[in-house]
C-alpha cells in the first residue's frame, strides 16, 4: 500500500476536523430553536463582519410619530412633487407605492371609500393598539380600518384621511423624499403602538428578555394601570400587556433586561446619544432597560446608570447644539417633543416637517465639522397611528409572527451619497436600521439576535459610493433651527392608548 505523505496526511486530518465542525454547527442549529434561520446562514448576512465600505462616521435616526405613506405622502402623487403617474399600488421602479383612491372598506356598501383631507394638526386620535392592528389587517384583507376606534372630535370615516398639503406644510417632507431616498416597503416591526415600537428601534425587541424574544413573547401595548412614567421608573401598579403566540396574555412591570444596540456600540467604542423629551416617556426606550436606567428604587424611582447620565439627553433640541459644536455622537436617536412629532389629536402638532428640516439643514449646511459628507440620516415614523394603508405587511414565520410585522411607515434616507429621487423596493423594518448601524460600525450584522437578525436587508441600496458626495441644498421650511433652540413650550405628552 502506498503511504500518504506526511504533509498531505496533516491536511486530510484538518479537512476532516473542519467537516465535523460544520456538521456539529448545523446539528446544534437544528436542535436549538433560538438559532438563526438557515436562510440567513446560507446567505452569509446574519453575522457579516467587516466595515461597510462607506465614508459614514455618523448615523442619525429621526423617529417621528403615527403616520402611513398613504396618509402623509399623497403629495408625491400631485404637482409640484409628482403627477398622476408618479404613484401606483403596483409600482414600477420609478413609482411611489401610494394609493390615492378606492381605499378598501368592508363597512362601505361599495367595498371602498375614497379618502378625504384633514390637517396635520387634527382634532382626533385613532387607536393603534394591537387589537386595532388585527381589525385593520382583517386576516390579510386589509379592509378593516373602519373598525378602529376614534377618540376626540371625529369626522365621518376618520381612518380614511390623508394630510392636506394645500398650505405647503408638508413641503419639507416631500422635498426630502424626492431629493433623496424613499422606501416603498418600510414596515414598523411591531403590530402595535409607541412603547414597543421604540423598544424595537433601540433594542431590536420589545420582549422582556432574550428568552422571551425567542419564545415570541413581546410587550404589546403602552402603559396600563397606575398612570405615570414608563419603564423601570414606573409606579407600583403600572404594567404593560404581553402578546404571545396564542394571543394577548398576561402583563408585566415595564422594566426589561436584555442587550440593546447601545451595548454593541459601547463594546466597540462607538459613541451614542438618545435625545428625548422626558425621562418617563413611553418614547424614551432606554428607560425600560434595567442596566441602562439603573433605577434607584424598585418602583417609582429615577434612572441613574452611567449610560443614562452620559448618553440620554432630555432636551431634543440639543441635537442642534451638538451639531453646531461638532459634538455629534456617532449614532444618535432623535425623539421630538409632542408638538413636533406629527402625532394626531392636537391642533398644535404641526412642527414636525420644520423640525426634521432643521436637523437635516444643520448637518447639510455644516462647514466646520464635515458632517454632510460623513453622515447618514434616517427619517422614519414609529407606527401607523390607526390610519389606512393599502399595503399588507409580511408576517414572519415562527413564533415571532404573532407580533411582526406591522403596517407600513414612511422611511426617507438622506445623505451625500443617496441619489436624487431614489425609490427602494426592498422590504425593510426597524431591524434594517439596526443592521445598517451594525454594518457601518462593524458590529456584526444581526448580532443582537432580535429584529436585526430577522431583517432581510441593511439599507445599503440607498447609497452610491462610485461617485463623489452630492452638494447640499437647504430644505425650505417655515421654522428654522433657532426657533427650536429657543422653544420654551412645555412638551406635549405622548399618547397612552
Please annotate each region the language model reported.
Residues 11-22:
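Bacterial N-terminal signal peptides
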Residues 27-497:
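N-terminal pro-sequences and low-complexity stem/linker regions of secreted or lumenal proteins
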Residues 7, 25-27:
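A composition/secondary-structure signal for short, hydrophobic, low-basic-content segments
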Residues 1-12:
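Bacterial N-terminal signal peptides that target proteins for export
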Amino acid at each position: 500500500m502506498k503511504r500518504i505523505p506526511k504533509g498531505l496526511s496533516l491536511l486530510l486530518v484538518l479537512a476532516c476536523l473542519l467537516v465535523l465542525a460544520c456538521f456539529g454547527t448545523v446539528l446544534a442549529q437544528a436542535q436549538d430553536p433560538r438559532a438563526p434561520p438557515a436562510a440567513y446562514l446560507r446567505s452569509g448576512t446574519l453575522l457579516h463582519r467587516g466595515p461597510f465600505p462607506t465614508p459614514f462616521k455618523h448615523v442619525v435616526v429621526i423617529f417621528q410619530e403615527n403616520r402611513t405613506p398613504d396618509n402623509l405622502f399623497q403629495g408625491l402623487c400631485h404637482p409640484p412633487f409628482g403627477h398622476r403617474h408618479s404613484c401606483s399600488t403596483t409600482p414600477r421602479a420609478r413609482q411611489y407605492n401610494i394609493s390615492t383612491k378606492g381605499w378598501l372598506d368592508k363597512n362601505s356598501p361599495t367595498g371602498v371609500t375614497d379618502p378625504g383631507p384633514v390637517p396635520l394638526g387634527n382634532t382626533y386620535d385613532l387607536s393603534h393598539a394591537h387589537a386595532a392592528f388585527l381589525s385593520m389587517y382583517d386576516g390579510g384583507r386589509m379592509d378593516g380600518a373602519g373598525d378602529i376606534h376614534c377618540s376626540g372630535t371625529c369626522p365621518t370615516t376618520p381612518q380614511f384621511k390623508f394630510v392636506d398639503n394645500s398650505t405647503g406644510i408638508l413641503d419639507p417632507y416631500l422635498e426630502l423624499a424626492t431629493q433623496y431616498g424613499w422606501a416603498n416597503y418600510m414596515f414598523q416591526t411591531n403590530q402595535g403602538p409607541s412603547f414597543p415600537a421604540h423598544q424595537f428601534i433601540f433594542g431590536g425587541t420589545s420582549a422582556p428578555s432574550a428568552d422571551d424574544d425567542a419564545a415570541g413573547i413581546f410587550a404589546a401595548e403602552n402603559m396600563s394601570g397606575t398612570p405615570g412614567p414608563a419603564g423601570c421608573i414606573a409606579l407600583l401598579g403600572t404594567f404593560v400587556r404581553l402578546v404571545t403566540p396564542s394571543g394577548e396574555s398576561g402583563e408585566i412591570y415595564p422594566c426589561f433586561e436584555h442587550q440593546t444596540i447601545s451595548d454593541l456600540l459601547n463594546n466597540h467604542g462607538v459613541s451614542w446619544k438618545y435625545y428625548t423629551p422626558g425621562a418617563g416617556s413611553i418614547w424614551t426606550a432606554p428607560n425600560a432597560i434595567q442596566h441602562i436606567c439603573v433605577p434607584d428604587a424598585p418602583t417609582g424611582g429615577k434612572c441613574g446608570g452611567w449610560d443614562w447620565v452620559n448618553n440620554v439627553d432630555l432636551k431634543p433640541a440639543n441635537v442642534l447644539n451638538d451639531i453646531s459644536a461638532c459634538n455629534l455622537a456617532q449614532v444618535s436617536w432623535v425623539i421630538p417633543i409632542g408638538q413636533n412629532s406629527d402625532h394626531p389629536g392636537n391642533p398644535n402638532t404641526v412642527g414636525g416637517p420644520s423640525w426634521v428640516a432643521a436637523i437635516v439643514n444643520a448637518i447639510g449646511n455644516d462647514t466646520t465639522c464635515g458632517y454632510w459628507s460623513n453622515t447618514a440620516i434616517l427619517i422614519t415614523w414609529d407606527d401607523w397611528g390607526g390610519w389606512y394603508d393599502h399595503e399588507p405587511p409580511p408576517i414572519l414565520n415562527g413564533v415571532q409572527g404573532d407580533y411582526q410585522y406591522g403596517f407600513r411607515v414612511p422611511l426617507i434616507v438622506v445623505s451625500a451619497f443617496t441619489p436624487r429621487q431614489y425609490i427602494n423596493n426592498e422590504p425593510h423594518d426597524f431591524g434594517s436600521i439596526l443592521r445598517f448601524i451594525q454594518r457601518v460600525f462593524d458590529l456584526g450584522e444581526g448580532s443582537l439576535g432580535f429584529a436585526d437578525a430577522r431583517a432581510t436587508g441593511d439599507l445599503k441600496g440607498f447609497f452610491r459610493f462610485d461617485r463623489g458626495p452630492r452638494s447640499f441644498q437647504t430644505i425650505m421650511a417655515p421654522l428654522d433651527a433657532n426657533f427650536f433652540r429657543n422653544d420654551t413650550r412645555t412638551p406635549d405628552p405622548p399618547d397612552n392608548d
